[in-house]
Amino acid sequence: MKSFYHYLLKYRHPKPKDSISEFANQAYEDHSFPKTSTDYHEISSYLELNADYLHTMATFDEAWDQYESEVHGR
């Protein structure tokens, strides 16, 4: 199963055009990001406590919904 982090990396872009691309770039630079996790609560807790680069959790929620839809077919 593909982790959320590995899914998110497909949105990396040298000149981010949206908040998810910006999030992907920053997560890539975050060496403590839970790279193998597929658990919403683990990742959201990490982001709330450690990711000052994420301006709003709505960006994570949008990316998570896309991850669930594309990877898990939900």
UniProtKB/Swiss-Prot annotation:
Domain of life: Bacteria
SUPFAM superfamilies recorded: YozE-like
Pfam families: YozE_SAM_like
Record family assignment: Belongs to the UPF0346 family.
Protein name: UPF0346 protein YozE
Gene that encodes the chain: yozE
